[in-house]
Each structure stands twice: as structure tokens, then as C-alpha cells.
Amino acid sequence: LAPPGERRADDWAHAASDLLARMDAQGFAAPEARPVRVTSYPSLEDKGRLTRNTRPEHVATPREAAVALIVGRRSPDLWSVAALRLVALGAAASSPWLEPAGAWWAGRWGGEPLERAIARAYFARLLPTAREAASRGDGWRSPLLLVPARAALARSIMECAPARHGAARAALLALLGTAPPGDLDSLCRGAGVEAPKVERRYAALVDSLARAGQSATGAPAPRPWRPADGFVRGVCLAHSVSLERGYLSASCAGELQRLRTLGANWVSLSPFGFVPGAGAPDIAMSADGGPDEETDESVAEAAARARALGLRVLLAPHLWSRGWTGSLEFGTAGWPRFFACYREFLIHYALLAEREGMDGLVIGHELGSATARDPGRWRALAGEVRRVYGGTLTYSANWDHEAEAIGFWDSCDLIGVSFYDPLATAPGATQESMTAAARRALASLKALARRTGRPVLLTEAGYPATPTAALRPWEENRRGVADPEAQRACYDALLTALDSEDWVAGLFVWKWFTAPPAPASADRSYSPAGKPAESVLVRAYSGWRDRPVRVLPRSGP
């Protein structure tokens, strides 16, 4: 496939040649003339469609690396090129240590200098120790922590090899076997080095790299929301579940442009984790899933496209389950495991949000049974997130009084609420009565804003295009006829009620797909795209471009 521009391709080729020359000079020359092929794709979507792998780069065959750039990045990391050289020297292409070792040689990973990734985790006290990095672990672990740590550990093992010709190479290649052992002592025995010496070298190395990483360049840092920024005119951008229609797609780029045109100034992005249900507290991640999922690279791509249009980004990780996540139950023995998994889930997305410069992060979404158990645990989790993430924090409470019961709003910057309060108690409600119902629901949130001294952000607010939209806004009835007029009336009621409430920080409309359903007239989903509700939203957002936000004086303890 033709590279994206001759000059860029030449630059990449020179960078790859320089990398291989450095490996040659340090005793990692290929045993024979062995050309390395780097296939460059115009976009991650193209790469994913043709290879079914949407990672920015991967080892496609023992002699070929496949690369593509996330929007806004100027060059690939080229860890895959270093990995190909290691494979040529005998490393297993399937080794879990191949990518970290390649990242060490390349000096880059995740679109930034390796020392910057290490610094982010190190100063947040999240970087794994040498023993933790060597361990296979119990369950999923964030690659945003594990890959940089293992890169440094691979280098430490090399540096602790005996001072004889070829020893460092032999030590590294021993680490890169098909099935390396899952603990530091066994790894070190296999590599012929002393584990205590490796631990000491690792500790010194990551400290040095982290201090260097403080001044390394990367994406702009998150910019927290402030009341002076004005009203958040947000839209929840939902991933249409396929590569060609989701966050990585050209369709998503078009919808982001459309949202900017209709007056939005923020979008939220929602990667998911799956919880099987009662008695199964583990979380299956989409972060490093298949090409049709909300992977890290797809979220990063959508965020970069949004920022390029002047849109700010709220990262809102969700859990989903076979039942409602607000009533998850794991029993006395299962809850500690759930919280351990959820911590890994949330810290991962905090790291991603910081790396990619996303301005806001939702630390939980409609998890009522979990938030009711231990406010102190949530407060501690928010504290851990703040060590690594510098943007705005909120939690998205369900509309049915969860917000009033939350005991850790003092750890958040905004009161987040999924606003699905009913606007009617029976069919046939008038526009005036629905507006009055919206005002009553907002009044209870205003009392919470006074008690906490924090503005309220409607992290979700929306209505399906169904006849029962005003009665049960939380229910997306996938059967029956579409009723776009009922959806329009609900939006009109909410937006009219919000018009005079300057203590509300903003709202995110639920939801707008990266590839809207067609035809819109028959679509029963929450999306207002192409329906009468869209014009109501455009009118409101156009009128709120300079809308101020007032922080109410705190009246509670």
C-alpha cells in the first residue's frame, strides 16, 4: 500500500534505518542480510479494514511491520521495527515481552517518548515494581502501565548481564521466549542474571527516566472546566459498533464536524467494560479489544479529531452487564474483587485521558449499588485518579435519587447526573406540564448544588423517539412505531426549563451515533439526528454560546 505522502514515507524510512543502526552498534545486528518491510496505511481505519488490527503498529509477519498514524501524530513509534530485528535474532513473535522490548529500543510508545509514559505512572505512584512487572498477574492489567514498566525491566535485565561479548543479547533473547515464566526470579534465572541486582537497577533506571520524562514533549495537557468557560453544550458521541462506522471511521469524522456546526462545544466518548453479572465481578475490557470495539486507539482518534475542530472532550467510561449496572450485586466475597478490577479499569482510562489531553473524566456511571457500599473507597479512588489526571472529575449518578445519596461529591469537581426524570405521568401531557415537570426535577438538583457548592452537569439527558418518551425516558422501546414528535416535545420541555437555570454547568445530549441510523424518520433510538428534535437542540445551543455559569454559595456541611 502506498505510504501517506512520499516525504513522510522517506522520513519514516530514515528513522527506521537509524533505529536498526543503533541496534547494530549495540550488538543486535541481524545474523544475515534481512530486509525489513514497513507497510504504511493512510489511516487506522484502512489498516484495520485490511489487516483486522487497528493498533497504530503491529508485527504482521516475521519480516513485516504494519503502521498507521492516529490523527495529529507526526510519526510512528517504530517499536515494531525493533521487534522485527529481535525476531530475526530468535525472539518469539508471540512473546508478551516483544512489544515492551521493541519500545525500549525505539524510545517511544503510545505516541510519546517512553520516558514520558514512565514519568506519568511513576510520579502518580502507579508504576509497577520490577516484581509486579515480571508477574503474569491475576486478571487484566493496563498496558499503559505494563508496557512502559516491562520496557524498563527488559533494559535492566540486559544491563545486569555478565560483562562478556553477547551476554546482554543472550539475556534479552532469553526473556523473549515463547512462554516466559511468570515471576522475576524465574525470568532472571533464565536470563542468567541476579534478581536482586535487576531490582536495584530497575528502581534506579525508572527514577532517572521519570525525571527526564517530566520535560519530554507530548500532547497538550487536559484543561479543566471552569465556570468562566461557560455552559457545556455537549453531545454523547456513541460508537456505532463496527470498524467502518465507529470511532475510527471517516463517518465519525463527519459527525464530529456536524456536531460542531449545530453548536456543540463538548463531546463525550464512552468506552465500555463488560461485567457478566451477579457472582462474576471481573471486567472484560474493550481497551485492547478487536477492531470493531471502542479500543484505546479508536477513542484517541476520535478525541484528536474532536480537538482539531475545537471541541473539548469528556471521557465517560461505562460498564454494561446483562442487567442494570445500578443493581449489581456480588456478595461479601465478590465486592473486593469488583473494586480491584474497577480500579484497574478506571486508572487505565485516567492514564489515557491524561496522555491524550481530554479535558474531563467520569469516574463512574450509574453504579448505585457500588457507590452505596463504601464512599471512602470511592474517595480514595478519586484521589488516585487525581495523581495521574489533571482534568475535571465527575461521577454520573442515576436520576432516581442516587445523586443525593453520594457521599464523595467533595472528591469531584462537578455533580454529574444522568437526567431521565419522567416528564409526564400519563399519555397526552401538554407542553406546559412537561416543562413544569422538568423544572421540578431540576429544583431538587439545585438544592444539591447549594448543599455541595458545586455546579451540576447533566452528563446524560435524552429521550427516545417513541410514544412513551415522556413517561419513561430511560426506556428505549425497540418495538412499535417511531414517534419523532414525542421526542421533540420532550427536548423542548427540558431545554426550555434549563434556559433560566444558570447554576447548571451544562448537559450532554444522549446520544448521537458516529454513523446515524437511516432513515431517521423510522429511527426509535435516542439520537435526535435528522429528526425534529435536532432543530430544537440547534436553537438552544445557538442561543447558549455565551451563556454564563454561576456557582451557588454552599449552604450544607
Residue ranges with predicted function:
Residues 1-95, 136, 140, 182-185:
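Juxtacatalytic substrate-recognition/specificity segment
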Residues 62, 93-214:
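Acidic/His/Gly-enriched intrinsically disordered linker/tail segments
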Residues 212-229, 236, 246-247, 473-479, ...:
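Aromatic-rich peripheral "rim/lid" segments of glycoside hydrolase catalytic domains that contact
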Residues 227-233, 238, 262-283, 293-371, ...:
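Substrate-binding cleft and catalytic face of glycoside hydrolase catalytic domains
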Residues 244-260, 339-352, 398-408, 488-497:
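Short, acidic/polar
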Residues 259, 267, 306, 361, ...:
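Conserved, mostly hydrophobic/aromatic
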Residues 286-290, 322-340, 412, 472-476, ...:
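Aromatic- and acidic-residue-enriched segments that line the glycan-binding/catalytic groove
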Residues 293-297, 301-312, 316, 376, ...:
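Glycoside hydrolase catalytic-domain groove-lining segments
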